[in-house]
Amino acid sequence: MLGMAKRSPIFAGDPALVALGAAIRRARTEVGLSQEALAVEADVDRSYMGGVERGEHNLSIMRVIKICGALNAKPSALLEEAGL
């Protein structure tokens, strides 16, 4: 793969992912967690969590469940807040 340009993830910036990321950020700040603390609790890297909040990652349902668990939030409530 030498010499090949790095491709952006196909879903990066999708409005649904951006809305979900914003809902995660709001929930995180509401409970007073830093991005790093949420990442530790959800068992992901801090830079990955930053990408989640910017809508750069297409999350698996298990990742959403782990993040919601760390936020003490229901996935359905977070999705509803995101308008999804």
Predicted features along the sequence, with ranges:
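N-terminal flexible/basic segments that precede or flank functional cores
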Residues: 1-26, 30-31, 36, 69, ...
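Glycine-centered small-residue hotspots that permit tight backbone geometry or close packing
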Residues: 21, 47-50, 83
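Helix-turn-helix DNA-binding elements, focusing on the entry/boundary residues of the two helices
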Residues: 24, 35, 46, 61-64
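Short alpha-helical DNA-recognition segment
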Residues: 32-51
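DNA major-groove recognition helix of helix-turn-helix/homeodomain DNA-binding modules
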Residues: 60-77
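Short amphipathic recognition helices of helix-turn-helix/homeodomain-type DNA-binding modules
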Residues: 77-84
